[in-house]
Amino acid sequence: MKLKFCGLNSIESLIHARELGADFAGLIFTDESPRKVGEAFLSKLPSFNFGETIPVCVFVNPSVLMVSNMIEMLPNSILQFHGEETDDFCRQFHHPFWKSIAVKDHDSYLLSANFPSAQAILFETHSINLHGGTGQSFDWRMLEGIDANNKFILAGGINQSNIKAAISMNPWC
């Protein structure tokens, strides 16, 4: 199983994630998030040694220019889309991407079929006000029936009291 730390917005947190062996480091590029990366941090990213940790650029309904700029800055990154992006929009960059699906009922996971080009699907808690980053878990039983051969990522509210249950869902990450 892979491990992703998300919402990293300082060089110190990136170093810590790398030292702990995180497979992925999530960097938030949306204004609605309090964990959005700042300009000073962004200016340091091109020279940062990620080691084995892969940066993940997290977007909500971004412009083509914004995504293209991040690919240029971090060519070894993965794109993660959290808005109303379509599969066509996401794959136009010819770059690996993950698509987030907000789980609100037992049929939510079926939406993953709309993203055949995604490298993985990230399932997280549905929120009326936010596109992720709630820190809340959802009832993971709503994913029963998901094809375990597909790469899926379980996100949101995973902590010491529910980590065993999260692992038992057999997520890729």
Describe the function of each predicted region.
Residues 1-173:
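Conserved N-terminal beta1-alpha1 strand-loop-helix module at the mouth
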